[in-house]
Amino acid sequence: CLSNVALLASDGKVVYHHAATSKFPGDRPITEKTVFPIWSMSKPITSVAAMILHERGAFKLDDPVSTIIPQLAKLRVKAGGGKTEPLKKQITYRDLLRHSSGIAGYDGSFDQQGTWKEVMELDSLVELIDLLEVKPIEHQPGKKHTYGLSTAVMGRAIEILSGQPFDKFLEREIFKPLGMEYTRFYLTEQDRGRFQPLFVKLKGKFRPGTPAEDELYYAPKSSLFLGGEGLVSTLGDYGRFCQMLVDRGKAPNGKQIILPKTLDLMLSDQLEGIPGYGDARKGYAFGLGFYFLEDTKKEGQNSPNGIFGWGGYHTTHFWIDPKNKLYAVFMARLYPYNGKTQTEFRKAVYEALK
């Protein structure tokens, strides 16, 4: 069994906590304070941060982002046969949050988008925009759901709209009010001593990951605050974020991080028939930063309608169940991503709730 931690909370109380350490060479004892790279579980945090600014009137969802990031107006679009064409419409904030901007970056498309290695070597979100400016996007904005670097671009938009570095905005608006003291874009010396090592599974066997396979450096002096990929966190910290979502946007100290109506908007179908997401995930729809289940019969499992959540590249995931007022978080450090852990964990939870 690979090292992992899991947490299930109902009505604000932990009802299940699990920590297991493997016997694989190179592993280390795992606890709820073990630090994990959460990769795409950064996206819901960034999406909430964006909607905080939306509530304050900083932007409307269908405003063009190019009004604050002019380089986005100059993007070219792939047109087939090695040719490109200009944008027919501008990328909007809604496009960034629902991944319909055409900005790719995952699923093998980095060769066309400026390789992931190029992204890793950058020092700031300004440099990220400069890199993306010279790369053609996959399709016209709004035409398809293409998972990629849209949320990272949103991080840069948040910097401009808020007038402060993205990491400081997250710290002030989300992390401090929720008590998420170990969640950040870098590793301290103490963090590195608690950083879960990566394991790679090939042909049914596990081996330790290499430094190159870690991919991100988490250097304290870097200003590359990748809002879609770059945060590290712990089981307890991410649980605090989840509890805020269960509590309809309210922090333990009573502060309203986001309004209930904003959360409802984030959990409404934003793709509305746009291809690229629901066609491959039966029963699920995509909102603004989260998946949500709208047809449990199509899913074919025992999860109730209305659950929502997301996962991360190295086999982390979470889900929120508003109806039962519960959340669950699972963290491991395994590549490639193992989706079975999420399915089996969730199935076991709802079997127990019968």
Feature map (PLM): residue ranges:
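Short clusters of small/polar residues that mark proteolytic maturation junctions
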Residues: A19-T21, P211, A332
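Short, surface-exposed loop or secondary-structure junction motifs
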Residues: L75-N305
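A short acidic/small-residue loop/turn micro-motif
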Residues: T21-P25, T67, L334-Y337
